[in-house]
């Protein structure tokens, strides 16, 4: 006869086996219901546009609806926290960017440690940003704008989508390299920030090409330079800031990645990564992204993890050295 200890061991092993079978089954059956992508910024920005382009195609690949839901606020913290609290079952995902690498510096009381709370799935796209000013701005080029800023510390204001967002950090890096003091005005997303820029309430903004190209082409804002080392195909004739602002090697590319709660099964992550890479390889998606100034990326979940770690190091040094988390440059 089995001893009580042996019986307990058999029961325990049986429970473990059943739990493993449950995980395997959930991964094998995944997805069996609609999937939510949480975008922690308002509609209309680059991250929202990229998400909607890809969600439709991924929905077709997975055979389940993929809906994009906007949860803006606190530089992406509110939406990210919602995903961090969600079940790790692959049905609530996060689309985020540089903010996920710098939250801890700007929001020390945030309810999650991003690197522990989330697992990377795939890099979706990268987009250069563009320095823009209101259409009636006296500044015709980046050099004159920065020269005025240097002579008048704190009088040139710049908008961002929130503290720690990629467009905040891009402008802050430009200011740091140029040795100028700018006044940061954070918003709850790039869309309301752009509206105030167009209205002339702000001096400048470094925003994604995706969000700004229609305003540039309609003459509502003036583009002074792009943050890529080469001219952007979607904005021919606009020089790189490395040249236009006399800042050699200045380059900032906004990236967008797909993430899941960290406890999510690796098998589910693999399903999502495969579907995302298939979507990003289609000519339709590549053209749709190119039309809004973005470049399709893809790759392994591990590659996104490496990028994420590099961004934590890169921006952490800038934030600490220039005290950006106190809203000072």
Swiss-Prot record:
Localization terms from the record: Periplasm
InterPro entries per UniProt: BUG (IPR005064), Bug_dom1 (IPR042100)
Organism of origin: Pseudomonas putida (Arthrobacter siderocapsulatus)
GO cellular component annotations of the record: periplasmic space
Name the UniProt record assigns to this protein: UPF0065 protein in clcB-clcD intergenic region
Similarity-based family: Belongs to the UPF0065 (bug) family.
Signal peptide boundaries: 1-27
Stored PANTHER family: BLR1237 PROTEIN (PTHR42928:SF5), TRICARBOXYLATE-BINDING PROTEIN (PTHR42928)
Main location: periplasm
Pfam families according to UniProt: TctC
Alphabetical keyword list: Periplasm, Plasmid, Signal
